[in-house]
Protein backbone atom coordinates (compact mmCIF):
# COMPACT_ATOMS: atom_id res chain seq x y z
CA UNK A 1 0.00 0.00 0.00
CA UNK A 2 2.96 2.28 0.63
CA UNK A 3 4.83 3.69 -2.38
CA UNK A 4 8.62 4.22 -2.47
CA UNK A 5 8.92 8.00 -2.15
CA UNK A 6 11.85 10.01 -0.78
CA UNK A 7 11.03 13.73 -0.73
CA UNK A 8 14.60 14.75 0.08
CA UNK A 9 16.68 12.95 -2.55
CA UNK A 10 14.55 11.56 -5.41
CA UNK A 11 14.76 13.36 -8.77
CA UNK A 12 12.23 16.22 -8.73
CA UNK A 13 10.64 15.39 -12.09
CA UNK A 14 10.22 11.74 -11.18
CA UNK A 15 8.96 12.61 -7.70
CA UNK A 16 6.47 15.14 -9.09
CA UNK A 17 5.13 12.63 -11.65
CA UNK A 18 4.88 9.93 -8.98
CA UNK A 19 2.66 12.22 -6.92
CA UNK A 20 0.88 13.98 -9.79
CA UNK A 21 -0.52 11.02 -11.72
CA UNK A 22 -2.46 9.37 -8.86
CA UNK A 23 -3.42 12.78 -7.42
CA UNK A 24 -4.86 13.97 -10.73
CA UNK A 25 -6.63 10.64 -11.23
CA UNK A 26 -8.07 10.97 -7.73
CA UNK A 27 -9.28 14.47 -8.55
CA UNK A 28 -10.74 13.21 -11.83
CA UNK A 29 -12.78 10.71 -9.85
CA UNK A 30 -13.86 13.59 -7.59
CA UNK A 31 -14.85 15.44 -10.74
CA UNK A 32 -16.88 12.42 -11.85
CA UNK A 33 -18.51 12.65 -8.43
CA UNK A 34 -19.62 16.21 -9.26
CA UNK A 35 -20.51 15.69 -12.91
CA UNK A 36 -22.54 12.54 -12.26
CA UNK A 37 -24.78 14.42 -9.90
CA UNK A 38 -25.34 17.11 -12.50
CA UNK A 39 -26.10 14.69 -15.31
CA UNK A 40 -28.49 12.53 -13.28
CA UNK A 41 -30.23 15.54 -11.72
CA UNK A 42 -30.54 17.43 -15.01
CA UNK A 43 -31.68 14.45 -17.09
CA UNK A 44 -33.63 12.59 -14.41
CA UNK A 45 -35.34 15.42 -12.53
CA UNK A 46 -35.08 18.58 -14.67
CA UNK A 47 -33.39 21.96 -15.09
CA UNK A 48 -35.10 23.41 -11.99
CA UNK A 49 -33.56 20.62 -9.92
CA UNK A 50 -30.17 21.41 -11.46
CA UNK A 51 -30.57 25.05 -10.43
CA UNK A 52 -31.64 24.00 -6.92
CA UNK A 53 -28.54 21.84 -6.44
CA UNK A 54 -26.38 24.76 -7.57
CA UNK A 55 -27.99 26.98 -4.95
CA UNK A 56 -27.08 24.52 -2.18
CA UNK A 57 -23.54 23.92 -3.51
CA UNK A 58 -21.84 26.69 -1.46
CA UNK A 59 -22.42 24.64 1.71
CA UNK A 60 -20.60 21.67 0.21
CA UNK A 61 -17.78 23.97 -0.90
CA UNK A 62 -17.41 25.44 2.58
CA UNK A 63 -17.24 21.99 4.23
CA UNK A 64 -14.67 20.86 1.67
CA UNK A 65 -12.79 24.13 2.16
CA UNK A 66 -12.54 23.53 5.90
CA UNK A 67 -11.08 20.11 5.14
CA UNK A 68 -8.59 21.63 2.70
CA UNK A 69 -7.63 24.33 5.20
CA UNK A 70 -6.66 21.85 7.90
CA UNK A 71 -5.25 19.42 5.34
CA UNK A 72 -2.88 22.05 3.94
CA UNK A 73 -2.01 23.54 7.33
CA UNK A 74 -1.51 20.18 9.01
CA UNK A 75 0.48 18.64 6.16
CA UNK A 76 2.80 21.65 5.77
CA UNK A 77 3.65 21.56 9.49
CA UNK A 78 3.92 17.76 9.52
CA UNK A 79 6.14 17.77 6.38
CA UNK A 80 8.60 20.14 8.01
CA UNK A 81 8.62 18.14 11.25
CA UNK A 82 9.24 14.91 9.32
CA UNK A 83 12.15 16.51 7.42
CA UNK A 84 13.66 17.35 10.83
CA UNK A 85 13.10 13.85 12.23
CA UNK A 86 10.34 14.95 14.66
CA UNK A 87 7.82 12.19 13.90
CA UNK A 88 5.83 12.47 17.14
CA UNK A 89 5.23 16.19 16.59
CA UNK A 90 4.05 15.42 13.04
CA UNK A 91 1.62 12.78 14.35
CA UNK A 92 0.20 15.16 16.95
CA UNK A 93 -0.38 17.86 14.33
CA UNK A 94 -2.24 15.66 11.85
CA UNK A 95 -4.46 14.35 14.67
CA UNK A 96 -5.24 17.88 15.82
CA UNK A 97 -6.05 18.86 12.23
CA UNK A 98 -8.61 16.04 11.89
CA UNK A 99 -10.20 16.73 15.28
CA UNK A 100 -10.49 20.49 14.67
CA UNK A 101 -11.94 20.22 11.17
CA UNK A 102 -14.42 17.50 12.16
CA UNK A 103 -15.72 19.51 15.11
CA UNK A 104 -16.19 22.68 13.06
CA UNK A 105 -18.09 20.92 10.26
CA UNK A 106 -20.33 19.04 12.71
CA UNK A 107 -21.34 22.32 14.37
CA UNK A 108 -21.91 23.99 10.98
CA UNK A 109 -24.06 21.08 9.76
CA UNK A 110 -26.22 21.12 12.88
CA UNK A 111 -26.85 24.86 12.63
CA UNK A 112 -27.67 24.70 8.92
CA UNK A 113 -30.02 21.74 9.43
CA UNK A 114 -32.03 23.71 12.00
CA UNK A 115 -32.62 26.60 9.58
CA UNK A 116 -32.92 25.02 6.13
CA UNK A 117 -35.80 27.27 4.98
CA UNK A 118 -34.23 30.65 5.81
CA UNK A 119 -30.87 29.32 4.64
CA UNK A 120 -32.30 28.42 1.23
CA UNK A 121 -33.64 31.97 0.84
CA UNK A 122 -30.32 33.41 1.99
CA UNK A 123 -28.49 31.37 -0.65
CA UNK A 124 -30.59 33.03 -3.35
CA UNK A 125 -33.41 30.57 -4.00
CA UNK A 126 -36.59 31.78 -5.66
CA UNK A 127 -40.00 30.71 -4.34
CA UNK A 128 -40.31 28.22 -7.18
CA UNK A 129 -37.01 26.50 -6.38
CA UNK A 130 -37.19 26.65 -2.57
CA UNK A 131 -38.98 23.28 -1.99
CA UNK A 132 -36.35 21.51 -4.11
CA UNK A 133 -33.54 23.33 -2.29
CA UNK A 134 -34.90 22.36 1.13
CA UNK A 135 -35.41 18.72 0.15
CA UNK A 136 -31.85 18.44 -1.13
CA UNK A 137 -30.32 20.09 1.96
CA UNK A 138 -32.22 17.87 4.40
CA UNK A 139 -30.64 14.77 2.91
CA UNK A 140 -27.05 15.88 2.55
CA UNK A 141 -26.39 18.24 5.49
CA UNK A 142 -26.09 15.37 8.04
CA UNK A 143 -23.27 13.86 5.94
CA UNK A 144 -21.18 16.99 5.37
CA UNK A 145 -18.55 15.82 7.86
CA UNK A 146 -17.55 13.01 5.48
CA UNK A 147 -16.77 15.56 2.75
CA UNK A 148 -14.41 17.19 5.26
CA UNK A 149 -12.78 13.88 6.30
CA UNK A 150 -12.16 12.98 2.66
CA UNK A 151 -10.64 16.40 1.90
CA UNK A 152 -8.40 16.50 4.98
CA UNK A 153 -7.33 12.86 4.90
CA UNK A 154 -6.06 13.05 1.31
CA UNK A 155 -3.16 15.30 2.35
CA UNK A 156 -1.99 13.03 5.15
CA UNK A 157 -2.26 9.85 3.07
CA UNK A 158 -0.10 11.41 0.33
CA UNK A 159 2.34 12.69 2.95
CA UNK A 160 2.63 9.12 4.23
CA UNK A 161 3.77 8.12 0.75
CA UNK A 162 0.56 6.48 -0.50
CA UNK A 163 -0.87 8.66 -3.30
CA UNK A 164 -2.37 5.58 -4.96
CA UNK A 165 -4.52 4.81 -1.92
CA UNK A 166 -5.61 8.46 -1.82
CA UNK A 167 -6.69 8.08 -5.44
CA UNK A 168 -8.66 4.95 -4.57
CA UNK A 169 -10.59 6.79 -1.85
CA UNK A 170 -11.93 9.21 -4.45
CA UNK A 171 -12.40 6.51 -7.09
CA UNK A 172 -14.47 4.18 -4.92
CA UNK A 173 -16.55 7.08 -3.59
CA UNK A 174 -17.28 8.15 -7.18
CA UNK A 175 -18.23 4.62 -8.26
CA UNK A 176 -20.66 4.27 -5.36
CA UNK A 177 -22.12 7.69 -6.17
CA UNK A 178 -22.79 6.73 -9.80
CA UNK A 179 -24.44 3.45 -8.81
CA UNK A 180 -26.62 5.03 -6.12
CA UNK A 181 -27.54 8.00 -8.34
CA UNK A 182 -28.87 5.69 -11.04
CA UNK A 183 -30.77 3.47 -8.60
CA UNK A 184 -32.26 6.24 -6.46
CA UNK A 185 -33.22 8.65 -9.27
CA UNK A 186 -34.16 6.41 -12.20
CA UNK A 187 -35.16 3.12 -10.56
CA UNK A 188 -36.70 4.29 -7.28
CA UNK A 189 -37.83 7.73 -8.51
CA UNK A 190 -36.72 9.43 -5.29
CA UNK A 191 -36.00 12.77 -6.99
CA UNK A 192 -33.99 15.32 -5.01
CA UNK A 193 -33.85 13.08 -1.97
CA UNK A 194 -32.30 10.32 -4.07
CA UNK A 195 -29.70 12.65 -5.61
CA UNK A 196 -28.64 13.99 -2.21
CA UNK A 197 -28.62 10.59 -0.53
CA UNK A 198 -26.59 8.99 -3.34
CA UNK A 199 -23.90 11.66 -3.14
CA UNK A 200 -23.83 11.46 0.64
CA UNK A 201 -23.45 7.67 0.74
CA UNK A 202 -20.60 7.79 -1.78
CA UNK A 203 -18.81 10.37 0.34
CA UNK A 204 -19.34 8.32 3.50
CA UNK A 205 -17.45 5.45 1.86
CA UNK A 206 -14.54 7.71 0.84
CA UNK A 207 -14.36 9.45 4.21
CA UNK A 208 -14.32 6.16 6.13
CA UNK A 209 -11.54 4.85 3.88
CA UNK A 210 -9.29 7.76 4.86
CA UNK A 211 -9.93 7.21 8.57
CA UNK A 212 -9.28 3.46 8.26
CA UNK A 213 -5.97 4.10 6.49
CA UNK A 214 -4.73 6.57 9.11
CA UNK A 215 -5.70 4.26 11.98
CA UNK A 216 -4.66 0.89 10.51
CA UNK A 217 -2.29 1.08 7.54
CA UNK A 218 -0.14 4.25 7.71
CA UNK A 219 3.63 3.82 8.06
CA UNK A 220 5.36 7.17 8.66
CA UNK A 221 2.55 9.05 10.35
CA UNK A 222 -0.15 7.90 12.75
CA UNK A 223 -3.07 9.37 14.64
CA UNK A 224 -1.91 10.27 18.14
CA UNK A 225 -4.14 10.24 21.22
CA UNK A 226 -4.73 13.81 22.40
CA UNK A 227 -4.52 14.32 26.15
CA UNK A 228 -7.41 16.07 27.89
CA UNK A 229 -5.31 18.13 30.31
CA UNK A 230 -5.61 21.92 30.24
CA UNK A 231 -2.02 22.27 29.02
CA UNK A 232 -2.63 19.80 26.20
CA UNK A 233 -5.87 21.48 25.16
CA UNK A 234 -4.18 24.90 25.10
CA UNK A 235 -1.41 23.44 22.93
CA UNK A 236 -4.03 21.93 20.63
CA UNK A 237 -5.76 25.30 20.28
CA UNK A 238 -2.43 26.99 19.54
CA UNK A 239 -1.48 24.43 16.90
CA UNK A 240 -4.97 24.57 15.42
CA UNK A 241 -4.72 28.33 15.10
CA UNK A 242 -1.36 28.01 13.35
CA UNK A 243 -2.75 25.42 10.93
CA UNK A 244 -5.68 27.72 10.18
CA UNK A 245 -3.21 30.54 9.49
CA UNK A 246 -1.26 28.38 7.03
CA UNK A 247 -4.33 26.86 5.41
CA UNK A 248 -6.71 29.83 5.32
CA UNK A 249 -5.94 30.52 1.68
CA UNK A 250 -6.88 26.91 0.82
CA UNK A 251 -10.22 27.43 2.55
CA UNK A 252 -10.75 30.74 0.79
CA UNK A 253 -9.88 29.13 -2.57
CA UNK A 254 -12.72 26.65 -2.05
CA UNK A 255 -14.96 29.28 -0.47
CA UNK A 256 -14.32 31.54 -3.47
CA UNK A 257 -16.08 28.94 -5.63
CA UNK A 258 -18.96 29.13 -3.16
CA UNK A 259 -18.80 32.93 -3.42
CA UNK A 260 -18.80 32.67 -7.22
CA UNK A 261 -21.89 30.44 -7.13
CA UNK A 262 -23.62 32.63 -4.55
CA UNK A 263 -23.03 35.89 -6.43
CA UNK A 264 -23.66 34.29 -9.81
CA UNK A 265 -26.97 32.82 -8.70
CA UNK A 266 -28.15 36.24 -7.54
CA UNK A 267 -27.01 38.06 -10.68
CA UNK A 268 -28.25 35.41 -13.13
CA UNK A 269 -31.67 35.08 -11.49
CA UNK A 270 -31.98 38.89 -11.58
CA UNK A 271 -31.11 39.16 -15.28
CA UNK A 272 -32.29 35.84 -16.74
CA UNK A 273 -34.52 34.14 -14.14
CA UNK A 274 -34.44 30.44 -13.23
CA UNK A 275 -33.23 29.47 -16.72
CA UNK A 276 -30.20 31.70 -16.23
CA UNK A 277 -29.38 29.97 -12.95
CA UNK A 278 -29.75 26.57 -14.64
CA UNK A 279 -27.32 27.66 -17.38
CA UNK A 280 -24.89 29.04 -14.82
CA UNK A 281 -25.12 25.81 -12.82
CA UNK A 282 -23.61 23.91 -15.78
CA UNK A 283 -20.58 26.20 -15.69
CA UNK A 284 -20.45 25.67 -11.93
CA UNK A 285 -20.40 21.90 -12.41
CA UNK A 286 -17.58 22.29 -14.92
CA UNK A 287 -15.54 24.84 -12.92
CA UNK A 288 -14.79 22.55 -9.92
CA UNK A 289 -13.34 20.01 -12.35
CA UNK A 290 -10.81 22.62 -13.49
CA UNK A 291 -10.20 23.57 -9.86
CA UNK A 292 -9.61 19.93 -8.91
CA UNK A 293 -6.98 19.43 -11.62
CA UNK A 294 -5.12 22.62 -10.68
CA UNK A 295 -5.49 21.72 -7.02
CA UNK A 296 -4.04 18.27 -7.75
CA UNK A 297 -1.00 19.90 -9.37
CA UNK A 298 -0.57 22.24 -6.40
CA UNK A 299 -1.07 19.39 -3.90
CA UNK A 300 1.48 17.24 -5.73
CA UNK A 301 4.08 20.00 -5.48
CA UNK A 302 3.19 20.93 -1.88
CA UNK A 303 4.88 18.09 0.07
CA UNK A 304 7.97 18.33 -2.18
CA UNK A 305 8.26 22.10 -1.65
CA UNK A 306 7.45 21.97 2.08
CA UNK A 307 9.84 19.09 2.82
CA UNK A 308 12.76 20.60 0.91
CA UNK A 309 12.04 24.09 2.24
CA UNK A 310 12.26 22.68 5.77
CA UNK A 311 15.42 20.75 4.84
CA UNK A 312 17.10 23.88 3.42
CA UNK A 313 17.28 22.79 -0.24
CA UNK A 314 16.15 25.86 -2.27
CA UNK A 315 17.20 24.44 -5.66
CA UNK A 316 14.80 21.52 -5.27
CA UNK A 317 12.07 23.94 -4.18
CA UNK A 318 12.55 26.04 -7.35
CA UNK A 319 12.56 22.99 -9.63
CA UNK A 320 9.29 21.73 -8.14
CA UNK A 321 7.68 25.18 -8.48
CA UNK A 322 8.69 25.63 -12.13
CA UNK A 323 7.49 22.14 -13.00
CA UNK A 324 4.11 22.80 -11.36
CA UNK A 325 3.67 26.13 -13.19
CA UNK A 326 4.44 24.62 -16.61
CA UNK A 327 2.09 21.70 -16.01
CA UNK A 328 -0.75 23.97 -14.85
CA UNK A 329 -0.44 26.38 -17.79
CA UNK A 330 -0.50 23.54 -20.32
CA UNK A 331 -3.67 22.24 -18.65
CA UNK A 332 -5.21 25.74 -18.59
CA UNK A 333 -4.73 26.29 -22.32
CA UNK A 334 -6.05 22.80 -23.07
CA UNK A 335 -9.17 23.33 -20.93
CA UNK A 336 -9.97 26.61 -22.68
CA UNK A 337 -9.68 25.03 -26.15
CA UNK A 338 -11.82 22.04 -25.13
CA UNK A 339 -14.47 24.30 -23.59
CA UNK A 340 -14.64 26.49 -26.68
CA UNK A 341 -14.81 23.66 -29.22
CA UNK A 342 -17.06 21.26 -27.27
CA UNK A 343 -19.44 23.66 -25.51
CA UNK A 344 -22.59 22.20 -27.09
CA UNK A 345 -21.61 18.66 -26.16
CA UNK A 346 -20.76 19.75 -22.60
CA UNK A 347 -24.11 21.48 -22.11
CA UNK A 348 -26.09 18.61 -23.66
CA UNK A 349 -24.66 16.27 -21.01
CA UNK A 350 -26.71 18.10 -18.39
CA UNK A 351 -29.89 19.35 -20.07
CA UNK A 352 -31.89 18.70 -23.24
CA UNK A 353 -31.40 20.98 -26.23
CA UNK A 354 -35.06 21.99 -26.01
CA UNK A 355 -34.57 23.66 -22.61
CA UNK A 356 -34.38 27.50 -22.69
CA UNK A 357 -31.26 27.25 -20.52
CA UNK A 358 -29.41 25.35 -23.27
CA UNK A 359 -28.78 28.33 -25.57
CA UNK A 360 -27.93 30.58 -22.62
CA UNK A 361 -25.25 28.14 -21.49
CA UNK A 362 -23.84 27.46 -24.98
CA UNK A 363 -23.46 31.19 -25.67
CA UNK A 364 -21.98 31.99 -22.26
CA UNK A 365 -19.54 29.18 -21.46
CA UNK A 366 -16.85 30.29 -23.99
CA UNK A 367 -16.63 33.64 -22.17
CA UNK A 368 -16.38 31.80 -18.87
CA UNK A 369 -13.61 29.51 -20.16
CA UNK A 370 -11.23 32.42 -20.82
CA UNK A 371 -10.43 32.49 -17.10
CA UNK A 372 -9.09 28.92 -16.99
CA UNK A 373 -5.62 29.98 -18.19
CA UNK A 374 -5.18 32.64 -15.50
CA UNK A 375 -6.74 30.36 -12.88
CA UNK A 376 -3.91 27.86 -13.49
CA UNK A 377 -1.17 30.36 -12.63
CA UNK A 378 -3.09 31.64 -9.61
CA UNK A 379 -3.57 28.23 -8.01
CA UNK A 380 0.12 27.36 -8.25
CA UNK A 381 1.16 30.75 -6.90
CA UNK A 382 -1.16 30.41 -3.91
CA UNK A 383 -0.03 26.82 -3.27
CA UNK A 384 3.62 27.85 -3.37
CA UNK A 385 3.22 30.50 -0.68
CA UNK A 386 1.30 28.04 1.48
CA UNK A 387 4.08 25.48 1.13
CA UNK A 388 6.86 27.83 2.27
CA UNK A 389 4.86 29.02 5.28
CA UNK A 390 3.96 32.40 3.75
CA UNK A 391 0.34 31.88 4.70
CA UNK A 392 -0.47 35.58 5.04
CA UNK A 393 0.58 36.36 1.49
CA UNK A 394 -1.34 33.35 0.14
CA UNK A 395 -4.41 34.48 2.08
CA UNK A 396 -4.23 38.03 0.70
CA UNK A 397 -3.98 36.74 -2.87
CA UNK A 398 -6.89 34.36 -2.31
CA UNK A 399 -9.09 37.04 -0.73
CA UNK A 400 -8.47 39.39 -3.63
CA UNK A 401 -9.21 36.65 -6.14
CA UNK A 402 -12.22 35.09 -4.45
CA UNK A 403 -13.97 38.10 -2.95
CA UNK A 404 -12.74 41.57 -3.97
CA UNK A 405 -12.13 41.00 -7.68
CA UNK A 406 -15.16 38.69 -7.92
CA UNK A 407 -17.45 41.40 -6.51
CA UNK A 408 -16.03 43.92 -8.97
CA UNK A 409 -16.63 41.54 -11.85
CA UNK A 410 -20.19 40.56 -11.02
CA UNK A 411 -21.45 44.04 -10.20
CA UNK A 412 -19.55 46.16 -12.75
CA UNK A 413 -19.25 44.11 -15.94
CA UNK A 414 -23.01 43.38 -16.35
CA UNK A 415 -23.65 47.13 -16.26
CA UNK A 416 -21.10 47.69 -19.02
CA UNK A 417 -21.42 44.57 -21.19
CA UNK A 418 -24.85 43.15 -20.32
CA UNK A 419 -25.25 39.35 -20.18
CA UNK A 420 -21.73 38.61 -21.56
CA UNK A 421 -20.42 40.67 -18.65
CA UNK A 422 -21.93 38.21 -16.16
CA UNK A 423 -20.04 35.35 -17.79
CA UNK A 424 -16.81 37.39 -17.89
CA UNK A 425 -16.92 38.31 -14.18
CA UNK A 426 -14.91 35.27 -13.07
CA UNK A 427 -12.28 35.55 -15.86
CA UNK A 428 -11.77 39.20 -14.90
CA UNK A 429 -11.16 38.20 -11.27
CA UNK A 430 -8.61 35.59 -12.40
CA UNK A 431 -6.83 38.06 -14.70
CA UNK A 432 -6.55 40.73 -11.99
CA UNK A 433 -5.20 38.12 -9.57
CA UNK A 434 -2.54 37.00 -12.06
CA UNK A 435 -1.46 40.62 -12.55
CA UNK A 436 -1.23 41.05 -8.78
CA UNK A 437 0.94 37.92 -8.40
CA UNK A 438 3.24 39.10 -11.21
CA UNK A 439 3.47 42.49 -9.50
CA UNK A 440 4.53 41.10 -6.11
CA UNK A 441 6.95 38.71 -7.83
CA UNK A 442 8.82 41.57 -9.50
CA UNK A 443 8.63 43.59 -6.29
CA UNK A 444 10.31 40.74 -4.39
CA UNK A 445 13.02 40.47 -7.04
CA UNK A 446 13.63 44.22 -6.88
CA UNK A 447 13.97 44.10 -3.09
CA UNK A 448 16.41 41.16 -3.30
CA UNK A 449 18.59 43.01 -5.84
CA UNK A 450 18.62 46.12 -3.63
CA UNK A 451 19.92 44.02 -0.73
Residue spans for each PLM region:
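Short alpha-helical transmembrane segments in multi-pass integral membrane proteins
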Residues: 1-23, 78-143, 189-247, 305-371, ...
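Helix-terminus/linker motif at the lipid-water interface of multi-pass membrane proteins
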Residues: 32-50, 120-127, 183-190, 251, ...
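N-terminal transmembrane alpha-helices
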Residues: 7-45, 58-73, 81, 102-109, ...
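Hydrophobic transmembrane alpha-helices of multi-pass small-molecule transporters
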Residues: 62-65, 109, 177-181, 207-211, ...
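Small-residue-rich hydrophobic transmembrane alpha-helices
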Residues: 50-110, 147-166, 279-341, 375-397
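Residue-level hotspots within pore-lining transmembrane alpha-helices
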Residues: 25, 29, 33, 63-67, ...
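Transmembrane helical elements of multi-pass membrane transporters/channels
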Residues: 18-37, 139, 150, 173, ...
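Short runs within selected transmembrane alpha-helices of multi-pass transporters and secretion channels
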Residues: 71, 140-158, 166-174, 195-211, ...
